[in-house]
């Protein structure tokens, strides 16, 4: 499931109803954050739905019960990414305004709890500072999918010409210029 909000809402139902392994993006992101965090102070940014679900909190606490968690919903980030402005002065301003409550906290790790947010990695990292490691839940999930496929003998190591299908919730024209 390539969406944090959808993972939080339906992962267990999908696992129960499908005969195949179903990966969500929350558990891999949480595991990576625990692995890299030295202070066990971890921040989570995501959509309102993801943050409200507390799915990351549950995942982190199930791995390390003494982790300290700070969560922040960032409702302006998805429209910012979908507008194509992710590396502009506007993006830097919105990132700074939005993440101000997390700045200068004791966290050393920040989970990007939305698959749109990796496009904002640069302004987020610059604002939060070099002492904060930024974790992309999508990247971590791709790593886990690769391991699962390899373990099952299903990982394709050949490089045939791939076929891509893209879906977007935003402007098709904007997406086409990006993709």
Which residues are covered by each model-predicted region?
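Non-catalytic structural scaffold of enzyme domains
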Residues: 1-179
